[in-house]
Amino acid sequence: MNNRIFDIILLCALSLILGSCKKSTPVSTSTTEQKSVVPVVCVYTLGAVNVDLQRAMMDSLRVHYPKCRMAGNIHLPDSALTTKRNDHKRYRADVLNKVLCHYKSDSTIVVGLTQADIGLDNFRGRAHSGIMGLASGIGTGVAVFSSYRPHGNGQLFSVMLHELGHAQGLRHCPDIKCMMQNAKGGNP
């Protein structure tokens, strides 16, 4: 029953994304280019990730990305640890994205899922800020997200769709109901 509710929420969220946001790149009107290509999404776990969380995430992803697959586990590199925290381990999301870029091909989107705390150094005037997810750039096809901050799988899946939107070329949207709205460092 819970998976069905998440699927309904995700379908509504995807409708919002597609209905209220625009790609950052021009859309072709050529009939030969209008064919919908469903990308292959390769999901890597970063560090230890609960099997139930992996399964729930993959079930929800497959609703929108039928070519989604678990691609393997990547050890959380010590080089990604921030030196700005002393109370617990936090990994720099930008460094994790650089690691994930090595697994990217032209025909895939690569996402990393972790249960570890992730963040960015020198983010919005703060020495270090914890975040829920980060795409490596608009349209780059690489993103990382963490279950550390989101409140439950529903919010985690929203973060996942938001970062996948960036990875596929979507920018932030001013509409507060849109999945691509900017959280501005908050927890929506």
Regions found by a protein language model. Name each.
Residues 1-9:
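Bacterial N-terminal signal peptides that target proteins for export
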Residues 10-14:
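Hydrophobic helical h-region of N-terminal Sec-dependent signal peptides
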Residues 17-20:
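C-terminal motif of bacterial Sec signal peptides marking the signal peptidase cleavage site
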Residues 22-35:
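Bacterial Sec signal peptide processing site at the extreme N-terminus
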Residues 36-52:
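Fold-level signature of zinc-dependent metallopeptidase catalytic domains
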Residues 51-159, 167, 171:
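Metzincin-family zinc-dependent endopeptidase catalytic domain
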Residues 163:
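Walker B catalytic acidic pair
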Residues 171-188:
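Post-HEXXH active-site segment of zinc metalloproteases
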